Amino acid sequence: MNILITGHEGFIGQNLGAYLQSKGHNVEGFEWKPNIIPDPEPYDRVIHLGAISSTTERDVEKIMEQNYEFSMRLLQLCDQKGTTFMYASSASVYGDKFEENAKLQPQNGYAWSKYLFDRFVMQVPEFMINVQGFRFFNVYGPGEEHKGDQQSVFGKFEKQAKETGVIKVFEGSDKIDRDFIHVGDVCEIIEKFIDVDNTDIWNVGTGTPRSFMDIAKLYAKKYNAKIEEIPMPENLKGQYQYYTCSHNKKLINSIGVHNFRTIEEYVNASKT
């Protein structure tokens, strides 16, 4: 298939592009530019990953322009051209319930932009194309180094362990549980959905949350590092998800049971 990936230079985009090409698909990429919408007509699928993904971004107009308004215009153009639209939503739209039909409680500008676009998708029943949204949980894996402070705790903890011998975690990290999913699993799941003939939004996570402390201990053991607990910054407390866990009933119904990678496999396989 001919596939366009927006945000193809990002963490998930780079991994997905390489994976789809390895499966025989023709993949091209697009990065956001002001007032430019790519033409979807030459493509069988548009996979829209491009977004401001920083949960600490404060420029709401900038977030809405790129994450909501651009997404809406691109979707409408795909509908006109007959190109299936697949896009990245986020588990950050959830509160303390994680079924796809649960009450949504976004806590920051990024999460609000994803929530509003999800709502737009589900409130417009007259699309002529399939529109598929994926609420990614906490994605980790190779290629996220460029994200800096926004990379997952895997990258942060490993860097600290290797460079300083001390891994800094927030106080109470043994009770901060997240549903971490390897980017390789995300790529495989998206490819499976290429053949799914349906419009909906699905959770994409493992369904098995692990604590920040679990990950810190794995890296501490690997690099013989110490763990130091530090206070959580006040500006994060009100917008922090202390627990996430994907409910995968809809995912399983659509593509079957997926065999997820474990965090132990990833940590132990990485080079020292």
Pin down the residues of each PLM region:
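C-terminal substrate-binding subdomain of Rossmann-fold SDR/epimerase-dehydratase oxidoreductases
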Residues: 163-272
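SDR active-site strand-loop-helix element
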Residues: 6, 46-50, 85-91, 134-136
